[in-house]
């Protein structure tokens, strides 16, 4: 999971990884044949457009009924294929976006603030659904999130970003890192209120692994 303050480059990183924007420097290496599913932070669809969930999932190419039903079930909205996209609740809309990302059974699922706008219960359900998807497909999951207290309980590895990698590793190691605390304070429950960080006033120790982490 990638965390960091607003404007730190989290969404830019994901868009670069999927090839949606050019690189100023560096390079991205992708395994041949790697299937990537992407759930954007937001997507605007004209509410006057007569677009059903099924038609949305068939863009840009058509899929069979079984594949669509399976993707919707995995995303947590079974039986909604014939519903209008404009009629979906915020949580259902996000799950429809996830279903679209799951259509080709990706090897890597990327999510950019995909739980944004969900209440606490909806967020918890969303993360549980992600765990089920990971178990069913055996895919890797790379996500950007502001839900720090959830991230630190659910993620296997955390990258703290602020225009560069401040620290990374196991969640317990990251929360103990001074670079992370300079950004978010010491209480991850209140971390969203603290976004103070000078990238030039901390040591650039970019790997802080818990010595017991595998």
List where the protein language model places each region.
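H-loop/switch region of ABC-family ATPase nucleotide-binding domains
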Residues: 145-146
